[in-house]
Amino acid sequence: MHPSDQTIFALATGPLPSAIAIVRVSGSRAGEVLTALTGSLPPPRRAVRCDLRSRDGDLIDDGVALWFPTPASATGEDVAELHIHGSRAVAAALIKTLSAFEGVRPAEPGEFTRRGFENGKLDLTEAEGLDDLIHADTDAQRRQALRQLGGVLGDRARRWRDQIIEALALVEAGIDFSDEGDVADELMGPARAKIAELSAEIAEVLAEQGRGEKLRDGMVVAIAGPPNVGKSTLINRLARREVAIVSPHAGTTRDVIEIQLDLDGYPVTVIDTAGLRDSDDPVEQEGVRRARSRAAAADLVLWLSTATDASDPDVKGPEVWRVRNKIDLATGEVAESGPSQPVFRISAATGEGFADLLRELTRFAAQYFGSAEAGLITRDRHRRLLADAAASLTRSLVPGLAEEIVAEELRASAHSLGRLLGRVDVEDVLGEIFGRFCIGK
């Protein structure tokens, strides 16, 4: 029996113990399983309280059962849901009973969603939106994921693909009537106009500069500077907990420490790097090398120094802010020199000036992400396939190109959009996409 023909089950809720747990069953034998456990099939889509019993008749739990007959279910198959008390023993007894049914097996990660995809309940971009929703850490990420799950990109791609196929039909009709010049011209003219319009529309989406991808991946802020200037104290204050060791001895931090922040709904990763200095210690040298590498790759660098040190930052990056720390210990201010980067005076230990720095970080994040929720593209896969589709459309518009070549380019463009939606040639990416889902989803 092919794995997709088997009935699957899994715990669909979080770690046990918990108030309740939900076990989901999907496949052709779901109704048989539900009847065996409860004695009868409940009315479709109605929660019914029932006794759940093993095949020997022993009581497993007093629970609730729901029945979703095909095709009106999340997977497009017969689906049963069993709501039980969230006890490890109860869940184990139910799973043991389910495992005893012939043709019924535990689900693989993401298999419920994959079956929904294969049965036309959602396209591949919507499945990716569901994955993003599951992994969303901030409110902005949640809203973007819901838009993708709702079909904001999939609906647009379907419309583009349908219009390309319409244009292709006109081109192929023009080829059929190539002996009748006037008829062929009348068909090719509207086709080229439609192609040009679609090409411009897809190009506009590609020009979004990765807003959706930025929101999905987050912004990276690196804290860099000489040893013993308070970098670990600052990251602890940003995290509102102790994540880095604070020591008066220089060189305490030798590896990169990361924390995740939610700045007004925007996802930000802050990294605490090793102090930058010359050292004979091979371990510290490696820490310094990593620190410079991570700072150079960051979207923003906070160059931390003491309040009396006005030297220029010793790192490169797209945006560098100078942060003068330990102002609570300083006896006076020093004049700033060098490039006109923002300068903040704080005490990471007492919190003085920290609110101003945090406010500017939040403002910078808002500018960095822009109106990210308006972006359609949230993954590199989307961008590559849309770029392929757009390139084929552009080539089809080359003046003097033979109609047969135009038709071939349009087929290639439609094929790229089909891959985007998961309609054609996507077996190589399905395992990667659905493998990210948890078991039971």
Curated annotation (Swiss-Prot):
Tell me the InterPro entries matching this sequence. Answer: AAA+_ATPase, G_TrmE, GTP-bd, GTP-bd_TrmE_N, GTPase_MnmE, MnmE_dom2, MnmE_helical, P-loop_NTPase
Residue positions annotated to bind (6S)-5-formyl-5,6,7,8-tetrahydrofolate are 24, 81, 121, 441
Gene Ontology BP, a term: tRNA wobble uridine modification
- Matching SUPFAM superfamilies, A to Z? P-loop containing nucleoside triphosphate hydrolases, TrmE connector domain
Cystine links in this protein are none
| A GO molecular function held by the record | GTP binding
Cofactor names? K(+)
- Specify the superkingdom: Bacteria
Entry's EC annotation: 3.6.-.-
Q: Which Pfam families match?
A: MMR_HSR1, MnmE_helical, TrmE_N
Main subcellular location of this protein, as a coarse class? cytoplasm
Identify the residues that bind Mg(2+). 232, 253
GO CC aspect terms? cytoplasm
- Comment on bound cofactor: Binds 1 potassium ion per subunit.
NCBIfam families with a match to the protein in the record: mnmE_trmE_thdF, PRK05291.1-3, small_GTP
Protein family (similarity comment): Belongs to the TRAFAC class TrmE-Era-EngA-EngB-Septin-like GTPase superfamily. TrmE GTPase family.
Free-text function comment from the UniProt entry: Exhibits a very high intrinsic GTPase hydrolysis rate. Involved in the addition of a carboxymethylaminomethyl (cmnm) group at the wobble position (U34) of certain tRNAs, forming tRNA-cmnm(5)s(2)U34.
Q: What is this protein called?
A: tRNA modification GTPase MnmE
